[in-house]
From Swiss-Prot:
Gene3D superfamilies, per database record: Imidazole glycerol phosphate dehydratase, domain 1
Name by which UniProt lists this protein: Imidazoleglycerol-phosphate dehydratase
Keywords: Amino-acid biosynthesis, Cytoplasm, Histidine biosynthesis, Lyase
Organism encoding this protein: Nitratidesulfovibrio vulgaris (strain DP4)
PANTHER family assigned: IMIDAZOLEGLYCEROL-PHOSPHATE DEHYDRATASE (PTHR23133:SF2), IMIDAZOLEGLYCEROL-PHOSPHATE DEHYDRATASE HIS7 (PTHR23133)
Pfam families for this protein: IGPD
Entry EC number(s): 4.2.1.19
Disulfide bonds: none
């Protein structure tokens, strides 16, 4: 039986950012990300690669101010693309969980593509105040925007660690692995006793 490729493209143009992305859920390892913020490029590349997605993403943002608008708008577009590619989410496993170590750091990511947006962000006291020249709260805002646009419950917990890069990398890989589990098709119907995900 041939299945339709789960794929979506999103474009967003505002006074703050210009974004174009294409996301393919059943990917072949083709990830190309250019946002103007190297740490964001790195973390998005890790997430897409570990999820098994193809991702082609470019963003031209107001980086002369800071990376906030770029990170938030990229997350909104990525979440929107995921929600569109999954359509009614029929047949997906829906839930994913991962713990990925990175040297001294360990983060845990749990998610449910339930149609109910929520971000639970724990343990960010382990993150240094500034990472790659940006305040640490940028990463909470990124994940909040992604969870909202993708309509998912997303719990990110930093369990321990010292190096900000390592902590973010642990969480980004964990997000990818959790997404890989959650988008997997393993049934013919919606995994919900109410018959729909919203």
């Amino acid at each position: 039986m041939q299945t339709v490729a789960r794929k979506a493209s999103v474009e967003r143009v505002t006074n703050e950012t210009t974004i174009a992305l294409t996301l393919t859920i059943e990917g072949e390892g083709n990830v190309r990300v250019t946002t103007g913020f190297g740490m964001l490029d790195h973390m998005l590349t890790l997430t897409a690669f570990w999820a098994g997605f193809d991702l082609d993403l470019t963003c031209n943002g107001d980086m002369h101010i800071d990376a906030h608008h770029t990170a938030e708008d990229v997350a909104l577009c990525l979440g929107q693309a995921l929600a569109t590619a999954l359509d009614d989410r029929k047949g997906i496993a829906r839930v994913g969980f991962a713990r990925v170590p990175m040297d001294e750091a360990l983060a845990e990511v749990t998610l449910d593509i339930s149609g109910r947006p929520w971000l639970e962000w724990r343990g960010d006291e382990y993150l240094p105040p500034v990472i790659a020249g940006e305040e640490k709260d940028l990463w909470r805002e990124f994940h909040k925007a992604f969870a909202s646009a993708a309509r998912m419950n997303l719990h990110v917990s930093y369990l321990y660690g010292k190096n900000g890069h390592h902590l973010l990398e642990s969480a980004s890989k964990g997000l990818g692995l959790a997404l890989r589990q959650a988008v997997r098709r393993d049934r013919q119907t919606v995994l919900s006793t109410k018959g729909s995900l919203d």
